[in-house]
Amino acid sequence: MKSRQKGKKKGSSKERVFGCDLREHLQHSGQEVPQVLRSCAEFVQEYGVVDGIYRLSGVSSNIQKLRQEFETERKPDLRRDVYLQDIHCVSSLCKAYFRELPDPLLTYRLYDKFAEAVAVQLEPERLVKILEVLQELPIQNYRTLEFLMRHLVHMASFSAQTNMHARNLAIVWAPNLLRSKDIEASGFNGTAAFMEVRVQSIVVEFILTHVDQLFRGDSLSAGVDLESGWKSLPGARASGSSEDLMPTSLPYHLPSILQAGDGPPQIRPYHTIIEIAEHKRKGSLKVRKWRSIFNLGRSGHETKRKLPLRVEDREEKSSKGTLRPAKSMDSLSAAAGASDEPEGLVGSSSSQPSSLMPESLESNSMEGEQEPEAEAPGSANSEPGTPRAGRSAVRALGSSRAERCAGVHISDPYNVNLPLHITSILSVPPNIISNVSLVRLTRGLECPALQPRPSPALGPGPPGSVGPLASDEKSEARSVPGPLDDSSPAAMTPALEDSLSQEVQDSFSFLEDLSSSEPEWVGVEEREVAKAEAAGAAGAAAFSLGEDDPGMGYLEELLRVGPQVEEFSVEPPLDDLSLDDTQYVLAPNCCSLDSAVSTPDVEEDYGEEVFLSAYDDLSPLLGPKPINWEGVGSLEEEAAGCGKQPPTQDEEEQACSETRQEKEAKPRSTSDNREEAEATPETEMEAGKADAEGGEAERSQKVMDSFKEGSREELEAKEENSEGREVESIKETKDVEKIIGEPGKDEEREIGREEGAEKGDDTPVDSDMDPEHVFQEDLVLEESWEVVHKHEAEKGRESETKELRRKSDLKSREDQGHSEDSGSPEEGDDRKEGVFSKEQKSIDVETEVMRGVGDHLEEGALSEGPGVELLRVDSTEEINEQTSEMKQAPLQPSEPEGMEAEGQLNPETCDLYSCPCGSAGGVGMRLASTLVQVRQVRSVPVVPPKPQFAKMPSAMCSKIHVAPASPCPRPGRLDGTPGEKAWGSRASWRNGGSLSFDAAVALARERQRTESQGVLRTQTCTGGGDYSLSSRTPPCSMILAHSSRPLSCLERPPEGTEGSEPRSRLSLPPRELHPVVPLVAPQRQTYAFETQTNHGKDEGV
């Protein structure tokens, strides 16, 4: 002792206790194990059964004091109050002793061998390997390691009180026992340091859990003494009984699947801190510092990464408690298993996947050693109903701090908290998204385009209704497949839910949170639902919850629907559109292939549900082609029949539905080609002519009167029933167009010309009108094709009809004055002033426009002749009358619906709507009124959505002309809300950029070539002063043959409109001043370029 003290005084390193070589120290001291270890172990075993022992740090001053005492006294009295009050200072000193050893207890030399040994997959082999490596340790190190391991096993047996089970102890002790010189030389930077930490913890944990197997009394020179000493320790088991140890190791053999065997490369950043229940956490700056050293700011789930040690390790970790960045005073593990007895350590160390379930971790950790099988149950419990086995397995491996996070219920695969735009996109399969090309970010709203559509089987129920809830409900449905949200009336289709891309679920499951998924959407969904119901088609299908995989619905509809319709909007690209907050919803209709052709009902819904621009640049096609007046007549007759019924929508609906049914039966076999499709409108016109010549005038007058009388009454009924009718009417219209279109092209053209000539007499009166008005008139004329057809049929009665129109214009002005929704008073004035002027202008402009359009349109049938102009003029007049009538009913959100409700639009008339495009090679334009479930779109500032969310067909992108959009007043809703006086505001859409009609036609042609069965639909919003609900009301009048080029291309915006500046013809010229004709709330008219090669598909739809 004297020599030691003397040497110590001299500063000789030999005499030092801390920081000296272990072997030298033991040789000098003559002890089997360092005195520091023995003293501290005994003290801790007696007094250290406290929470966080060996994990928490003691007071640094106490540690330093105790250190000095060991240096001087060699065996200080640890039972003094200072140490009893700060037990952690003793445990901290013990760790410090090993940490300061020049050569770690397991030595630098054997680091690689230990790493290789634990990399072995099978536990028995790993055990052998580890044993071999341990045999290579110096005897002093081996004895010291055995003593320490047995001490730790003993302490682990109190894991219930200390929360320090074998795994936690291994994590805490590993850095002090096993280190790599190479990694230390590198400065502990990069993944190597994390790998080291993982290897350390795996090695130490394995040794700790296999103490009895690895250390046998006979292997130690002083084994007998050590064993006796250990046996004397309370709770210590006879180390020699390997038999007892074996069962504990068995659990490990079962889980030997553990990835730990995969080796260090899989080792993920090691967390020195074990995850603890947060309620137990206590604070200590020192501990925080210490934790920061090992935690490296990593989250608890990183422990999962390192869990891949071996199955046993992984299980143990999970069962023992998840490792988490420990807060200073927290216990390292969530719950230590009572199983942490020396054997228990093994058992407990056989972590149970229960780590997935934080709550079960604690209990499981205790039970783990005893019930190795519990692991399986634990894992199963972790995600009881989860289909994602792979992800669940990963979770099971790792400690589940993340799972504990309330905000992120990883364990709940179905709930997803994502931005609405993301969920909406996710709701649709990627291929659908690309097809629709309508995917875009919506502000706070689900992308309607992504909304699930009711499959044709579901019925005409407005598909849009499904959309709002779709993504949220879908996520919820996933989480809780059983109960669907009550918010949706329709039961979710489990098949659709199942069909949801598993990949999407897997990729976003971590975000899933059931709690918040639906509420965000509820308002919007309700709104849409109401609209869908108003449409009358809502039904139970209206809300097939988002669970019905909207994506799957899309796929089914897109794939199976006969002629596939790829809709593109001539309006500014959706990507560029700025969404109006909740109102801007993309109707699923836009995306469904069915919408254009297959199911008129659905089509109607879809069509109007499209984003309606404030006003669509593309006005109804200006088809110079004369419309078959026979077809027109028939349309007028139908309209008249319906018009007579206007006061009662039910009657109208019945009549229209009957007509539609009849026509629907006919049309679907008619058009196999574009030519047929194009021809069908003409044929319809001809048929209409034949029928209408006799009684068009009378019928038109009756219809107009009925419109006037019933418009107001119908407005209400229309809002309710119009949607359903529109669907029917659209179907019928399509059918009628198909049936009538083929034979009547020639007749229609001839008649158009003749009538044009006749109307030419009247035309000069309209010449005063500005071309802009003419365009508007043309739009109106399209809507008032009935009237035009009637005029042509009656040719002699044109003057009378004009007078009636004038009267109707006056009435419409008054009506408009009453109902501002339908149109601004300016529109009313325009109508009054411009009925004749519009006719003239329309003739002039049409003539010019049609000439210009004729160049671009393959349809040579579009005649620029006066007949067409006259037709348009007449139609304009009729439209004015109808407009006045409709103005009375402007409240109807969806004019097409409203009109149909009024009886003006019959299914037949809707069919007649189709504009005769050119005969051959032309794109058949069909005016399809659609449900006005459209959300209002503001044409303005073009705000492209984030590129990853904006998906638009490449072909489309190239053709879209984006012009600076001028801000416009919020467009009124087409959903029938009268309060929104935004109809006029739609004109602002004109100012927004959009596809030129030529581009649209070119697109249509290209697509027709590539997709023989595909139906291109160009949807345009009829915006502008002339576009009034009333004008749109008479479907027959809308049948007017217009050049297939939309008027918007030709028209100029009224001076009053914001974007009135002149535009190039390709970019949709801005409107100029419109005559004071009252502008009924413009409604979106959908013109479909249809190449219906498969009429059979239409029928099937």
UniProtKB/Swiss-Prot annotation:
Chain positions found as Phosphoserine: S578, S875, S996
Pfam (any one): RhoGAP
UniProtKB keywords: Cytoplasmic vesicle, GTPase activation, Phosphoprotein
Site (Arginine finger): R55
Keyword Phosphoprotein on entry: yes
Signal peptide start-end: none
Region of interest: Disordered: 305-397, 450-499, 622-848, 878-901, 968-987, 1044-1076
One annotated Gene Ontology cellular component of this protein: cytoplasmic vesicle
Role description: GTPase-activating protein (GAP) for RAC1 and RHOA, but not for CDC42.
Assembly description: Interacts with RHOU in a GTP-independent manner.
Name listed for the protein in its UniProt record: Rho GTPase-activating protein 30
Annotated source species: Mus musculus
Gene that this polypeptide is encoded by: Arhgap30
